[in-house]
């Protein structure tokens, strides 16, 4: 009798722990789904509400990304969350449609991230050509290609059952029934489909993103060093003017603070790009590694032998959710620039989200020969908001000839733009969006 009581107590403890685990899982997954819904809905609502956000072509790609992530939160995550909490798949034959939605929405999200990286690299490396070529029509074509490719590798193979591996076999050698398969909604991918879909959905896009963001960093690094050179020239000229006021010839030293500021800016750009790539890779890479490994698992081997490439379902599901979690982080990474922050604060009714900074901004003016003729600090509020940025393109300091660029020449002209004023904001958030190029008269192109 005491033995039976002990056994019942242990079973009750196991049931209680299992129930507690399910409750914690439900709370965590609910928060993840709600945060994904809220963030991406805010992005869509901001663009619908504020016309100036729709006027920027680069925001079209952010909207497409938000829509794909919103579909992940509506069509994919809730159904899997219910199955995780219930311990089985309660939606029957909806499994195949859900698998197609999962592949389509996740692929669309990743491809939109890839398109954004290409768009920002093109905008930063060739701003004049970007201004002419990247029209709303061109943006819609790129977005349509991303979504069409996502549909083609999801619904067509799934509906034709090209994605499935061989039917699962039970221990007695019989093929598992349809009901047993539907209880789990386990889509055992074939080796061919797993590798080909992973290449299109992840490996090729991530390779493109690595190349584009690496080149963006190199361009930004060159630009920051050019700005630092202008700073040093401005401070040097100011120091010399102050020290030679009495007519004496005094040697003027170059300040070390400018070198430190240059390093600080380069580090900030590197951190920004590292966050963009790091979050994406950390979320999706583990899943796609497992996605290519699992089809090679030999589950028919005897229990005593080792089974390489075999992963338990819990581990696989954890990394699936890691990938979907990227959809909740994308609005924070890609839509939290100044324009979107102001729109969010207006929509939410909390205007203190975007406090106005009071740090000083240095204005450096350069004459036609490249000599610095004025350098002074002004409060941030006295500078137009259109100028309150850090240029991340070489053309912001040295002008280019659009005709030369169109013909294939990419070398900047030696002379600087006449009366060009460069705004050097020390604390502004770095943005990798399109920056309006500067024309030959030193004004921003409208």
Curated annotation (Swiss-Prot):
GO molecular function, one term: dopamine neurotransmitter receptor activity, coupled via Gs
Residue ranges that the UniProt entry lists as topological domain Extracellular: 1-22, 87-95, 163-191, 299-315
Cytoplasmic side: 49-59, 119-137, 218-271, 341-446
Gene3D superfamilies: Rhodopsin 7-helix transmembrane proteins
Gene Ontology BP terms: adenylate cyclase-activating adrenergic receptor signaling pathway; positive regulation of MAPK cascade; vasodilation
Bilayer topology: Multi-pass membrane protein
Keyword Chloroplast set for record: no
A Pfam family matched in the record: 7tm_1
Segments passing through the bilayer: 23-48, 60-86, 96-118, 138-162, 192-217, 272-298, 316-340
Residues where lipid is bound covalently (S-palmitoyl cysteine): 350, 354
Record: glycosylation sites: 4
Quaternary context: Interacts with DNAJC14 via its C-terminus.
Protein family membership: Belongs to the G-protein coupled receptor 1 family.
Function: This is one of the five types (D1 to D5) of receptors for dopamine. The activity of this receptor is mediated by G proteins which activate adenylyl cyclase.
Protein name: D(1A) dopamine receptor
Organism field: Didelphis virginiana
